[in-house]
Amino acid sequence: MAVSDKYVEKTRTWNDNWNNVIRNVIYPDEKLRELMLIPEGTDILKFIDKYFIRDGSTDELLTNEMVRIVCRDEKMSRGLGSRKVTGHFKTFDIFVNEDVEHTATEDRLQNRQVLIAERLKYLLLRQYNCQNLHFDFEDEYDQWTKTVGYKLYRLTFFYITTV
C-alpha cells in the first residue's frame, strides 16, 4: 500500500466548523439578536461584517452600533501531550453603548453585556458537540475600561483541534 493510499483528503476544516457555529447557532438565535439590538431583516453577511466581527484588533470604528462583538482565536502555549492536538482560546469582546447598557430588562438592573455573555454561554455550551466543536467555559470579566462611550465585557472559551 502506497503512502498516498493512506492519505484522506481533508474536506472540512476547523474554520468551517466555526463558520457553521455562526451560521447555524449564533446568527439564528432571536434572543441574542434582540439583546444585540440588531435591526430586523439584517442578513448574515451584514451581521458578521458590522455586529459580530472576527478580528483580533479591529480597526472598524464603533459609530451607530449600540452593540458590537469582536471575537478572536488564540493558540494555547502549553502542550496537551501531543503535537497533533492544539488548544485554542475563543475570546469575545462585547462592546455595549452606555446609553443602552441598562435597558435590556424592564427593571433596568441587569447589564446588557452580561446578558449577552450569558446567552453566548448558553448557545455554545448547551450541547456537548456544537457544530463539531466542544467548548469549555474558561473565564469572563468586566474590563473596567471604556471605549469612548462603550463598556467592554470579555468572555473566553477553550476548545481543542486535532491535525
Predicted regions mapped to residue ranges:
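Oligomerization/assembly interface segments of phage tail-like spikes and tubes
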Residues: 83-102, 148-163
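Hydrophobic beta-strand residues in large extracellular and virion-surface proteins
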Residues: 22, 26, 69, 92-94, ...
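Small/polar-rich, solvent-exposed N-terminal microdomains that initiate assembly or binding
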Residues: 1-82
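Short histidine-centered catalytic/ligand-binding loop motif
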Residues: 99-112
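Hydrophobic, well-ordered secondary-structure segments
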Residues: 14-15, 110, 114
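Acidic-leaning, charged glycine-interspersed low-complexity segments
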Residues: 33-35, 39, 64-65, 112-163
